[in-house]
């Protein structure tokens, strides 16, 4: 029975890539800078001491980081016995965003340039805004700028509740984000607005990767909170991913846990499981792993590393999340059967010590574990698509156009 379990620690980069200068990210290192802060006692908020990731270390994380950066992360064990295969991978795609990273993991790098809204104020074309107001029958809109999602709620959340005007904002990513109050505006109404925005962006030729619904609750600035009902409306990958090939060619199954289905625009997904928060995502993943039959991929995105700690530049929170993940990792490893493979990886970096609030262009870890996987270094990989090609070979689908089999 062949099954693959893919766990994406969203934004968990392990050192700047060779082309990081194109992105202003030379020197970025999500893992390294978190470990450094922990070792100095600068991340003792809710946790204490050096970064403690014994299980990820045994799977080769510290070695992969050393391969990427040339140094061992502060306070971590560079001499631990390694029981998995490990690598550090460079991104072939032109961006450092979520869809590009995930699509490339599944064998389809993004070799075109996304469209972006680069103006920090008055970010969106007036023609687009006018169409949204008219089609969705809106009283107007707020925002129309670049912003952190939590900051803009404190700035405009109360006005949104009073006026019913949705909050439109973007970032350095190829995104159009809409924040609305779940109760006063309504979740269904927000989703409908996002569908309209997706249609207008596509028909207008803006080439924007995602429209993101950002629902929130609360009654005043300072206590607004985003909920787990986020919904991403992505464009479809430009070619069949390994997920699609497994379903189409082998009548296989692909289970999405968390936001995976949204990222792939539901292409190649046979079952969707929603969960919010690290523990809930872990619980859902464990249940799906236990239920998984032959020719199945269980694919989970642990979004909190990116959304809750990376973008918010919360080093202690990120460290605490990693330690929780590591504590629970043996539960996943115990479910890996004789012919199964477990792959732990990331989709980009988001160094919480870095300037600004955006992603960072970094190598990602590729940690592969299974009874038949030979432990040791798989070296520097030229593309995340090596993961997709490895899965294509493992399941016996037609090969992907990019990437090399690592096993």
UniProtKB/Swiss-Prot annotation:
InterPro entries listed in its UniProt record: Alkaline_phosphatase_core_sf, DeoB, Metalloenzyme, Phosphopentomutase_DeoB_cap_sf
EC numbers on record: 5.4.2.7
GO process terms (BP): 2-deoxyribose 1-phosphate catabolic process; 5-phosphoribose 1-diphosphate biosynthetic process; metabolic compound salvage; nucleotide metabolic process
Segments traversing the membrane: none
Residues noted as binding Mn(2+) 1 in the record, renumbered to the chain: 10, 347-348
SUPFAM superfamilies: Alkaline phosphatase-like, DeoB insert domain-like
Subcellular location: Cytoplasm
Keywords, ordered alphabetically: Cytoplasm, Isomerase, Manganese, Metal-binding
Stated name of the protein: Phosphopentomutase
Gene Ontology cellular component annotations, sorted alphabetically: cytosol
A Pfam family it matches: Metalloenzyme
Organism of derivation: Salmonella arizonae (strain ATCC BAA-731 / CDC346-86 / RSK2980)
GO molecular function per UniProt: magnesium ion binding; manganese ion binding; phosphopentomutase activity
Enzyme type, top EC level: isomerase
Assigned protein family: Belongs to the phosphopentomutase family.
Cofactor annotation: Mn(2+)
Chain residues that bind Mn(2+) 2: 306, 311, 359
Function: Isomerase that catalyzes the conversion of deoxy-ribose 1-phosphate (dRib-1-P) and ribose 1-phosphate (Rib-1-P) to deoxy-ribose 5-phosphate (dRib-5-P) and ribose 5-phosphate (Rib-5-P), respectively.
Cofactor remark from the record: Binds 2 manganese ions.
Entry superkingdom: Bacteria
Principal location listed in the UniProt entry: cytoplasm
